[in-house]
């Protein structure tokens, strides 16, 4: 409880990086689904970054800071080309700075077998997740049940003062 008597919920942070409007809309639908189904014991926040913005070093740094604090990171793309170097540079910036990550999601707008570079992107992000001891999921092949993505309430009790300060 806060000093005003209202209950303070821990923050569940989502960072979305996306290729274009279509992939942003797809990621937003996934976020909205999460928001609609996430237990009401969490305050859900999101940051969205377009691939193009990661070309600018200062913005890439800001996006990396956001990702380092995130519980869930979604990379939304078509998969018809390799991830741009600016995006992989961004991934390498935050992946070593993760505290207690929950999940990394590769979100494609078509099945990976229908996109020339989706499997390469998927494999790269899966390696990143493994190095960072994160859960890894890909879509449209199937996301897990929602409760897998949400940290155990007891595991964040100690972090609640940090969540409140953020």
PLM features per residue range, with description:
Residues 59-62:
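Short acidic active-site motifs
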Residues 16-18, 49-50, 73-78, 104-109:
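Conserved beta-strand segments of the P-loop GTPase G domain that flank and frequently precede/overlap
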